């Protein structure tokens, strides 16, 4: 599973130069989560999970507060969660998750991004079966054995726990997100380097230098779209 963690590191490495885009995406997601129930993370589990993820990207409080206030007040925008699946060069696969208030616009934009950058959209289910929906955590200061012991004491059976250059990575079922995070907090973990939901590939592929350049342009084009929240793929980027 080491390569899967590299996928997350790639996202983190891009964080500094894409902060405004990341903040905008979280602002939208926080608004939708707050609008779906009580605008209080204590009583709204969906909102709580979004806020926990936002912390790992250092989303400022004013962005969070503004989104929640909008949900409390006159905000009447309705958003749909959409998923697109497609293919890039030489067997590469992508999953594109979007949050949009205009389905036709988003579908057109995603299709154009694929078509202009060496890819093509697939039908629903053509790619997703090759990925696993996963809750992923990254913590420092706790060894693999310590984390495993903590989880065993709480009777939490996760998919895997690995070490990656001193960072302990936990892969769990999506519905274990809050349970795993609470257990690690009780064991003294104060900061999560990663707390994220991922679609992780069951197998990875490598591309030639030429194909990888095309693939990276495709990812950039998709991630630059206003409505796109996440892009997951099966390529081991070198």
Swiss-Prot record:
Signal peptide positions on this chain: none
UniProt keyword terms in alphabetical order: Cytoplasm, DNA-binding, Transcription, Transcription regulation
Gene Ontology terms for molecular function: DNA binding
GO cellular component: cytosol
InterPro entries: Integrase-like_N, TACO1_YebC-like_2nd/3rd_dom, TACO1_YebC_N, Transcrip_reg_TACO1-like, Transcrip_reg_TACO1-like_dom3, Transcrip_reg_TACO1_YeeN, YebC-like
Pfam families attached to this UniProt entry: TACO1_YebC_N, Transcrip_reg
Coiled coil (residue ranges): none
Gene Ontology biological process: regulation of DNA-templated transcription
Subcellular locations according to the entry: Cytoplasm
Predominant localisation class: cytoplasm
Family: Belongs to the TACO1 family. YeeN subfamily.
Xref: HAMAP family: Transcrip_reg_TACO1, Transcrip_reg_TACO1_YeeN
Protein name (record): Probable transcriptional regulatory protein SERP0322
Origin organism lineage: Bacteria, Bacillati, Bacillota, Bacilli, Bacillales
